[in-house]
Amino acid sequence: MGKLLLFDCDGTLLHTYDLIAETFRQTFELCLPNQTFTEKDIRSYFGPTINDTFRFLSNSEEKYEELMSTYRKINLELHPSYIHAYPNVKSTLSFLKSRGYDIAIVSNKMKHVIRYGLELTGLSDLIECIIGSDTVDVPKPDPMGIRMAMKHYNMNQAMMIGDSIIDLQAAKRAKIPFVGVTWAHVTKQEFQDEGADYVIDDMVELLGILGE
């Protein structure tokens, strides 16, 4: 395997669950005040792009645009108060970079929002290439983002690290190994049932998989 590591962002590098959940709550209160959304409803909107989520919830183009603009405004305002890196993420990425690994992000989040989160958490200097939802024509689980990152580095091999089944499916379609992380929402058993190559409970365990 080449020394290219592709990470999802939310739920993998950055703890953003509370940020995203609160953004959804405030957006729904403002834009859909007559509808009720449970915590289970909100959890179901994690993973798909917000474009897909708000298309599903909208009954008009006007409502869709209102949801999108409101969500983006609130999300950026809440970033400094809610976002942080998971334990051992920064130290592990720093070590891997010192060992010659190229580190990229392939996410279903917009590129400028990813960059903002990396800056707030001190990770931006460790990651050169960011593939976001606005970089590709089709988001994960389509493998387009993975292939774009591999092309950027002129590599035909890589490894994907992510917290969702969508990440796993994208890696499978791109025919690269996948490492599932358990500190977000998907359990070790769920990843194994879906055919993950590896599953880790702490980012530092990635070093063992890589022989470092």
Tell where the protein language model's regions lie, with residue ranges.
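Asp-based, Mg2+/Mn2+-dependent phosphohydrolase catalytic module
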Residues: 1-3, 94-97, 111, 115-212
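N-terminal helical cap/lid subdomain that shapes the substrate entry/recognition surface
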Residues: 2-90, 99
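Conserved phosphate-coupling serine/threonine residues in phosphotransfer and NTP-handling enzymes
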Residues: 12, 107-109
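Sparse, context-dependent recognition of short Cys/His-centered cofactor- or disulfide-binding micro-motifs
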Residues: 27-31, 39-42, 52, 68-74, ...
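Residue-level marker of regulatory loop/turn positions in helix-turn-helix DNA-binding domains and
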Residues: 85, 106, 138
